[in-house]
Amino acid sequence: WNADNKPGISYISYTRLKEWKYTEKGWFCYELCVPEPPEVSEIMDGSCLIRIKPMTEEQCEMSERCVRGLGYQGQNLLCSNWNVENMSELDYNGMFEYLYGMKYGEKFNSEDYPNGIPKEEFESLIMEYLPITAEQIREYAVFDEENQTYLWARLGCFNYAPTFFGTSLPEVVDIKENQDGTVTLTVEAVSDMVICDDAVITHELTVRFAEDGSFQYLGNEILNDGIMHIPDYQYRIKE
């Protein structure tokens, strides 16, 4: 599916499949025949997912607007339970680069901030997307009081262990308008690596849209026993 939500063919290949299935949610899952131990020493991933059933235009718009820019690695907005009364466990230092990309449409360049992210810039961006005060951010995030900057570190082997879940793609599958003016988005984490699962977890993300088109995240709730399928979160920077 392209950016206009229309099907297209990007390439054609001919290969053997080990197994395949079509899910109720409209995904074609298949596993390629790849070398296996003892022929190779490391597991090769032959799993793939292709969406057959199209998403609605509104689902596509909300997915692109609210969740695709975040994903499930490097920050924990979508993979933890939180609300406006309980925001202390969010990884603010980790989420900054993702919110930066959503706001400015370009990748965060850490070389522009060799000594950390200035307090005003960091706090204003976080407060644009979350109902939180500057004082709370300084309390919850890793803040350099002496230099008045927030620390940032690139994801790497010392602060992140890659997981199949982390590479999952968030997709909005349902949209509910609440009486208080907020909107609850039902989101599924779709993974095409090894486990090949069209909903590793399902969670409800609550947002509030403003008349100017901006929005704030108000809370996230992981449904059923989904929290059991999420690896322990590694904070980008430890105090």
Describe the predicted segments one by one.
Residues 1-239:
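Mature, Sec-exported extracytoplasmic domains of Gram-positive
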